[in-house]
């Protein structure tokens, strides 16, 4: 390959297409209808490397540029490229897939160690092992509002705390309204309640933190028994912390941006967050606010039944006639909002909000997307079929499909999706690692990418494979901040022509092919496929193999 490119002085544009097509040529099935694929009677699309070597030996410059032109034209039809590869990956043949993954992984690791990403992570904070997966599809924001009776704050029946946040458990039946926590008449009672929580509970039972309490949240008394469950309490604590951060963010000069991300629109005037939360919705014979509804409808042992279902709220904001979706979800104590929409409401679409991608690439902030399948180990993400410009996203534990207008839009949305799961328990430990590779492979194959986009893609591949790697001092970096993550991924050094031509795209393609082929072979039990096995007889944990690779 290198000899061919140098001998015929191929520029970077042709070189990238030639390298990419060489990698996917073994997957290609050609009909030979146009006959432009034939070189001396041999199909160059199916036997690209063989034809390339013959041309190099003959020193045939005309044939060389004809071959490069064929590769370039073929690669422009990205829909066909994707379909050819998808079909080939689903029909694995006899090969040592584990060895190939190791080879690709080591090549990628060498390039990662010499990249600017390694130096940038030194400034990141230390990894927090207690974190969980969080997204904005659920919210604990209603519990920040203060329940009052005849204008006076109700007294709690039980008090707890999580770090600087006081938890006040009360009886919702004794309340006639809920008001914003930052209005002037409530400042003194709220600070007094913070002082009482600090005196009653000196230190946090979850973290041991013994500092001051500066915020309070009111929870229905019915939730208290479930807070004794460690897993339940851990998730509620994190959503409570996110809600407190949200109320401070909404007061800043960029607060409109946060409100838009949460609801899909930002009303004019002061305190837009309170406007949305305390807006009265007609339904069930009398108007209700989101805060009132969330406080008065009790959940069960599942944490999702106690939070505000934001996907359904966004639908209600844009389609007020469908506000009953929110009430129905709460009263039915459902866990997955998209399953509820798809199976309980016979609805095929919902609204996906992405302010950051809109700011970066100029696409629409609110996108109507198709509801896909619920995450299920029996249906690997690789088997979800995508056509046209469709790409795959994920809302909590449910997939959805959307149409990306450009490769950069698909790439940015994919980066944000990957980050969302990494800032939780990490995608390097289970099947989400393969999910990240699949999403990147879809972008790599389906869209024509610029040098800048390929540079971003390379850093994302390195991150998915080696983002867990320790720094020089042995600590693991924490990637939870989306802004810091995107700064490293989007603003890194752009690959030069020499680097771009030395096989990064080919490495990424081959690694994608191996991981996707492995997932197919595991599920369909191909007899002639040499699938690596671990002691349990299942396909080995490739993520663990990649981790061992770094240590070596």
From Swiss-Prot:
InterPro entries: Orbi_NS1 (IPR002630)
Similarity comment text for this entry: Belongs to the orbivirus non-structural protein NS1 family.
Protein name stated in the entry: Non-structural protein NS1
Originating species: Epizootic hemorrhagic disease virus 2 (strain Alberta) (EHDV-2)
